[in-house]
Amino acid sequence: MMPFQYYHLLNLFQMKYLEIKTCISVCQPHELSEKEMQVVNAAKEACNNSSSPYSLFSVGVALLLSDGKVVIGSNQENAAYPSGMCAERVALYQAGALFPKTPITTMAIAARTQEGFTPHPCTPCGACR
């Protein structure tokens, strides 16, 4: 028999199915607007702020806000690797803390190894998947 409190919560919060979709555009640089190219370049520059002594994989993110501001983030590893912070979360948390009511319109992600920037988009970290 189900405890009354649990049964009551199930009836109170009718379960429903929600579907969330995300669209990702993979473009060549010549297909981007000038503003979008600025955001990509900001993401590349943000790689310079990465602290990635363990993975040697620097990730930079730039977010374009609806008011035209750009917020950046980079991955931050620590001695408890791999439980650092990914660049996406750093940028999103910073945007949320500094501009909580301003929507994000665009996210650009750049990844760099010791050989240079990756030629293909990188996958999200394990925490973001």
Give short role names for the model-derived ranges.
Residues 52-54:
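Charged, well-structured alpha/beta interaction segments
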Residues 12-41:
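Short, compositionally biased leader-like segments
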